[in-house]
Amino acid sequence: MQPLLFQSASRNGSVQSGTPVERPSGLPVLFHEKIAPMQSSHSSAQNLRPLIPLADYQRIFRVIHSVLHSVEADIPAASFFFSVTAAQILKKFYKRNAFPVAGAAFYLIREDGGGALSFGSLGDDGQSVTSHQDAFHAWVQCDGYALDFMAPLFQELLVSAGHPLPVPRQMFQKDLQRMSADVQALAKPGDFYLASNLELTRELLQQFMAKKALTNLSQLCLEWFRKPPKVMPDDLALQGADGEVSRIKLQATAIEGVW
């Protein structure tokens, strides 16, 4: 199915029924909605502090992005690679219990509260969400947090889906207790709703591990990464099967803030 720009006008804070929103290969679509502000029902114990500093998040993102860029990968469709590799970095260098998760994801990204980035399928009732091999997103879950290392590329993801809108390059890592109750509860930029799909995660992980090219690239990221404040090499030498040496340059994509 081709990407859709989902338009809806809500009544009493609810999303009108419409065509389910899907995007092949996990690419996003943007749907517009007007949602009445809601009182937060989250626990007062929710943690507002990030799990890792912005500098560390940015470095993890840059390493993975640079390696994928060097092999001309389809980066907008690489959320699972980002998540698997970032989880391994968090395990190895930060001793965190991190793991990749696939499923449906919804992020409110517009200041006026009128647009949400959607990965997966939204049902006619405006509440039920589903995900599958052709409509999903992936993120990292770690010690009660959700971290999305593709968040700095949300604008590129929208462009690839046919919705060129300006989106700031920002870090996404949130205490899961801060997650909205459902899609309709998204009220301000940075609000999110995630629906994990364990079966899909297992399938994607099995497929990932079966592809040596992917596991080699992921391992390359782990070998290149240096945890701050250690100095990070600006490039990495690679020797091909024919003995030719090429160099991967570290992309200097800057993250401007946080969701």
Label every model-predicted segment.
Residues 3, 8, 17, 23:
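Cationic, low-complexity basic patches in intrinsically disordered or flexible, solvent-exposed regions
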Residues 9, 13, 28-259:
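A structural boundary/capping signal
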Residues 19-20, 28:
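Intrinsically disordered, low-complexity segments enriched in serine/proline and basic residues
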